Amino acid sequence: MGIHIKRWCFIILVASAAYILRDSFDPETLANTRVLVTGASTGIGEEIAYHYARAGAKLVLTARREHALQEVKSRCLELGAKNVFLVVADMASHNAREQVVAEALSALGGLDYLVLNHIGWTPFKMWDGDVNHTRWLMEVNFLSYIHLATAALPYLTQSKGSIIVLSSLTAKTPIPYTTSYAASKFALEGFFSSLRHELTMQNNPVSITLCILGLIDTQSAMEKIKDKITMSAYPASDAALAVVSAGAGRQREMYYPWFVRPLCFFRDWFPQHRDWFIQRMYHYNS
């Protein structure tokens, strides 16, 4: 019995490695595609915009900071984007979400990719009972994603397009210091996985790609974790390329970096050992 289990584990790991390492992404397939990227002024969202720009896509970029968006726009045009339009918006506002989709459709004449990347500010600390912040974070990290996807879905259906959702390892395997953030990502996982079922049952051509990311070296992430974590962070540009590639390939899920997939796969096999291992990667001084 033990031999069979080990054999199947080996087969699964080999198959996963082959799946991860395959490289079938052709950037030319994204030329002239119409793309809306949220949270595009910095971090992974900024890098995602640059990868689409290199492929010659038409972009609508949205975030709260206009000056930062203008800088990203200039760089996108240098890299080869066909057009770049900006929408300054705060995703905590219900009206702003509808405005973003409406302006994107007006500027682009339709939509092929909706990339949901924005997040609300989240302190990296132990749970302190701040329910109000959690409520606000769910509004920005979860409900705004639903609002945007719902508004864009009829137009993505017309184009047989894709929804790309930036998620996190915390949506699969909870980690310390991220209680409210993890709750919002778990909610995203549940909603969009269920929506994928429903679209398939309705023969709707829209694909949904959930991007499960580990620790990425964005400025905001590095500032928050400081001396609280021992694991290495991975490049935002590489993570962004993996996101764009997975979306173009209409993958159900994408995991980056590579070890996130097996970590999620084995999460329920040895939960106590998993938790022990995770907790040893974090520092806590009471």
UniProtKB/Swiss-Prot annotation:
Substrate binds at S168. Its main location: secreted. The keyword Secreted applies. It comes from Xenopus tropicalis. InterPro entries: 11-beta-HSD, NAD(P)-bd_dom_sf, Sc_DH/Rdtase_CS, SDR_fam. Keywords: NADP, Oxidoreductase, Secreted, Signal. It is an enzyme of class 1 (oxidoreductase). It comes from the Eukaryota. The keyword rRNA-binding does not apply. NADP(+) binds at residues 39-65, 90-91, 117-119, 181-185, 214-220. The active site is at Y181. Residues 1-17 form the signal peptide. It holds the Pfam family adh_short. Its EC number is 1.1.1.-. It catalyses: cortisone + NADPH + H(+) = cortisol + NADP(+). Belongs to the short-chain dehydrogenases/reductases (SDR) family. PROSITE patterns: ADH_SHORT (PS00061). Unidirectional NADP(+)-dependent cortisol dehydrogenase (in vitro). One of its GO terms (molecular function) is oxidoreductase activity. It is found in: Secreted. This is Hydroxysteroid 11-beta-dehydrogenase 1-like protein.
